[in-house]
C-alpha cells in the first residue's frame, strides 16, 4: 500500500472527519462565547464593580509614571509591569460559560440518544439447567 493511499484511508475514516468538523465548529463557537463574555457579560459585571471595564482591573507592580492614564494598555506601553487580574477573570469567566454551554449540549445529545433495549439474558449453560432440575426434584 502506498503512502498516499494509506493517508487517504486514514483521512477518510469517519472518526478523523468527525474530529475535524468538531474542531472547526468548536473554534467558531469559541468566538461566539468570546463575544458574549466581552460584549454582554463583562460590561454588566464592570458596571456592578464601579463602571470600569473589567479587563482594565490591574495592580501596577511599579509606580505609574506621571501623565500615563490609568488604563491597562497605557500602563503596559509605559513599561510598567502589571498584575492584570481583570483579564484573567475575563478569561476564566469565558471558560466557565463555554464549559457550561458544552455541558448543556452534551446533556441534550445524551437525552436525544435512544435508549437501547436491554439485551435478553443469555440462556444459562446446560449444566446450570440440569443442576436446577436436580435441586427442584430434591425439594419435592
UniProtKB/Swiss-Prot annotation:
The chain's coiled-coil residues are: none
Instruction: Kindly indicate whether the keyword rRNA-binding belongs to this entry.
Output: no
What is this entry's stated membrane topology? Multi-pass membrane protein
Here the disulfide bonds are none
- A molecular function GO annotation: mechanosensitive monoatomic ion channel activity
Has the keyword Disulfide bond been applied to this entry? Answer: no
What keywords tag this UniProt record? Cell inner membrane, Cell membrane, Ion channel, Ion transport, Membrane, Transmembrane, Transmembrane helix, Transport
**TM region(s), chain numbering:** 16-36, 86-106
Provide the Gene Ontology terms for cellular component.
plasma membrane
Tell me where on the tree of life, at the top rank, the source sits.
Bacteria
Give the location in the cell.
Cell inner membrane
- State whether it acts alone or in a complex, and with which partners, per the record: Homopentamer.
Which protein family is it in?
Belongs to the MscL family.
Q: What does this protein do?
A: Channel that opens in response to stretch forces in the membrane lipid bilayer. May participate in the regulation of osmotic pressure changes within the cell.
Sorted alphabetically, which NCBIfam families does this protein's record hold?
mscL, PRK00567.1-4, PRK13952.1
Q: What is this protein called?
A: Large-conductance mechanosensitive channel
Q: Can you name the source organism?
A: Anaeromyxobacter sp. (strain K)
Q: Which gene encodes it?
A: mscL
Amino acid at each position: 500500500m502506498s503512502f498516499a493511499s494509506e493517508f487517504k484511508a486514514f483521512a477518510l475514516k469517519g472518526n478523523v472527519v468527525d474530529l475535524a468538523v468538531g474542531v472547526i465548529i468548536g473554534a467558531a463557537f469559541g468566538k461566539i462565547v468570546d463575544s458574549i463574555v466581552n460584549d454582554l457579560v463583562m460590561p454588566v459585571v464592570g458596571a456592578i464593580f464601579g463602571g470600569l471595564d473589567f479587563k482594565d482591573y490591574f495592580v501596577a507592580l511599579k509606580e505609574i509614571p506621571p501623565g500615563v492614564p490609568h488604563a491597562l494598555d497605557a500602563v503596559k506601553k509605559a513599561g510598567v509591569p502589571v498584575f492584570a487580574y481583570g483579564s484573567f477573570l475575563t478569561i476564566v469567566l469565558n471558560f466557565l460559560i463555554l464549559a457550561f454551554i458544552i455541558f448543556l449540549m452534551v446533556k441534550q445529545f445524551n437525552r436525544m440518544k435512544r435508549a437501547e433495549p436491554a439485551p435478553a439474558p443469555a440462556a444459562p449453560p446446560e449444566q446450570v439447567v440440569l443442576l436446577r432440575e436436580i435441586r427442584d426434584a430434591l425439594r419435592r
